[in-house]
Amino acid sequence: MKRIVELKERNYADASTHADAPVNYEDAIENYKRILDITGDITANIIAPNSEAVDIEGPHLIDNRMHYASKTLENIQATRQAGLWGVSMPRRYGGLNLPNVVFSMMSELIAAADAGFQNIWSLQSCIDTLYEFGNEEQRQKYIPRICEGEMMSMDLTEPDAGSDLQRVMLKATFDEKENCWRLNGVKRFITNGDSDIHLVLARSEEGTRDGRGLSMFIYDKRNGGVDVRHIEHKLGIHGSPTCELVYKNAKAELCGNVRMGLIKYVMALMNGARLGIAAQSVGLEQEAYNEGLAYAKDRAQFGKKIVNFPAVYDMLSRMKAKLDAGRSLLYQTARYVDIYKALEDIARDQKLTPEERQEMKKYTRLADAFTPLAKGINSEYANQTAYDSISIHGGSGFIMEYKCQRLYRDARIFSIYEGTTQLQVVAAVRYITNGTYLSIMKEMLEGELSCDCMKGLRDRVAKLVQLYEEAVEKVNASENQDVHDFLARRLYNMTADIIGSLLLIEDAAKAPELFKKSAHVFVRMAEEEVIGHTAYIKAFNPEDLEQFKAVEEENEEA
């Protein structure tokens, strides 16, 4: 953390011009703690108590405008008054200059209180993309507004362009007379779609049909030209408005350069959003575990509390182990992102030293490798934990009066939006096949542990790394791309199992009283998965694919 603060604060230069800026590392950490305390107070006393009413009411569509649920407005007002907007932005624009690690902690706290509101609040991170790729005039125009509490959205998806964003057809044409761009078309499934400032992916190049014809634009609601045609009625996250938008010759500004919208800017935007979903997942997972544990301690059957039944404490211990491992993965990823982004920011103002360039290259690679792991596996853990929380509640979990049913409904989208888990596998698979993850695992195995009590457990994980290496070699040896794609999810899960185990072992070595039990449980789970997946992969032959394709053929014959 010390390196992150050092890079973010640049020798604490802001202290001379901003009264709230830290003067040293200790001061910065105290500042982060104060902000987290404020966030925790608001989530506990306002957002969480409002969550049930928000879930019931949801947003409203009136005259082509979206209106938040009344309690959502209370949440927004509370976070505005506390200054919790634009928090990652430099102080010169009105931000708090917080690192991603702290932003992720805030996201986790808010998501535990209400995952739908976390969507609305965390979309402020879209401003990072404008800060990185917009010009200085745009930064000065828009960033202070976000820091004051205005809303953002990223308008990417269309009816015929979901995961395949290169099919986006919303049209951008340059208006020579007004010296601006005009946007026309429809966007669908836009979270917080009636926001104040939108980042919009649109087709600027006439006659193109692939990603190279797409650019990124800034739409300001103050200029008008966009209607909300529909608000989706969803399974969960009811407080988060999901909108269909109609762009009617809407005035917009180009962000960055033409043709770079998808291949560069959206990739940066999505990586930030995926880290946000990882934090959202961990927050909800914590709440689902808390609800399950509290119910198990209170509910008695057959003369004793159900928490004392092996079937129940098995579930609870697995929930806790996934939570602890997933959280460790989240914050390791956030640390990597913080270091490379801080160095990128410094490089805008001055030339980096050769050592700094190498450091940025290293942490960019690590962040790129860890982000799809953190998003994918934590979103899956959130779904599993919410499911198990309902199981612990039994029939009561199926009743709307209990919170666990809402957590279950809210969690379902986590493994879908901002790239399905299958797409996270696609993003991660090259780091599997080229040995990046394997190198990380081996480096972690060689690292010093704070406590010898975890060495035996790490030795067991070392055996899993050997199996993992054999499984990767088996897949790499195949020249059949369908085999690679078919087995990729198993390799991805194995990667998360092993890296999660090693991270949790490091945590347990530092704080055995907090993480030792979870580390033991998680390693057992990892052994169960890695050994099973390795056996499956080693026994798999290309012709086996036909057995799975046959399912579709049988349906056609029927």
Each language-model region and where it sits:
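C-terminal helix-coil-helix/basic helical segment that borders enzyme active sites and/or dimer interfaces
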Residues: 324-375, 472-486, 505-509, 513
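Alpha-helix capping/hinge segments and adjacent helical runs
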Residues: 83, 155, 237, 361-445, ...
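A short core secondary-structure module
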Residues: 180-226
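N-terminal glycine-rich flavin-associated loop
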Residues: 118-136, 162
